[in-house]
Amino acid sequence: MTNLKELRINIEKFPEALHNTLKDAKIYDSSSSPEAQVLFIDKKDGYYLKIASSKTLEREAEMTAYFQKKKLGLGYISYLSDQSQDFLLKKKIQGENYLAKQYLNNPKRLCDNLAENLRFLHEQNFEDCPILDHSERYLKKVEKNASINNSNLDFVNNYNIRTIEEAYDYIENKKLLLRNDTLLHGDYCLPNIILDNWKFKGFIDLDCAGVGDRHIDLFWGAWTLNFNIGTDQYRDRFFDAYGRDRIDVDRLKLVGCCEVFG
């Protein structure tokens, strides 16, 4: 864990149920978002402890348990919530994400593998999923962010949208295209899929997972290839490997416009 910052913590500030896991362990800051702190606990096979505002990790706990049931990841050990904070303790999935040099050094294979794993996820049965209305939740977040002028046009560079107003108008005209017919990761990016020598091991960071529109994952799959590899040249290859017959360009553009306000 040499690339992570080691932390000194006061165990007494954590819920008593976590003390045994935290005791005598090296703790590292593995956070990647301002919304939550993630601690890596270097003990046994490794644990991750996610800490965020009260009730904000409930959905991730539900979907983490569901993905374990579907053999798509490991479940959580404990989910604790009080008036001010949530704590979600999870086991580390053994392996590395797509950002490991083994994968980044072979971008064509990475692209194809990323698409194949997404198609595998999207073909799963979802009848007993606890989150069946991701599209409605997604659009609600868009409306909230639009109302406070929280926007970023970088997400529509490929879609000939030049202004915030154009993006919002497109959403208003096309939002009924979004479906709830596919099990999603919701944040399908290279850091969130764990592999062992190219073999799929599991999905992590499932706070946006649920049943929604496949084009959300397709959008983020194409985006992460550009962002993490540094070129957009694998975009078409990714869509081809996933299956062009299952891609609606209007819904893909709609998701891009939604992410302007994401």
From Swiss-Prot:
Assigned keywords, A-Z: Antibiotic resistance, ATP-binding, Kinase, Nucleotide-binding, Transferase
Annotated catalysed reactions: kanamycin A + ATP = kanamycin 3'-phosphate + ADP + H(+)
EC number of the protein: 2.7.1.95
Entry GO MF terms: ATP binding; kanamycin kinase activity
CDD domains: APH
Active-site residues annotated for this sequence: D187
Short name of one Pfam family: APH
Keyword Transferase (UniProt): yes
One BP term from GO: response to antibiotic
Stated family: Belongs to the aminoglycoside phosphotransferase family.
The protein's name in its UniProt record: Probable aminoglycoside 3'-phosphotransferase
Organism in which the protein naturally occurs: Lactococcus lactis subsp. lactis (strain IL1403) (Streptococcus lactis)
Organism placement in taxonomy: Bacteria, Bacillati, Bacillota, Bacilli, Lactobacillales
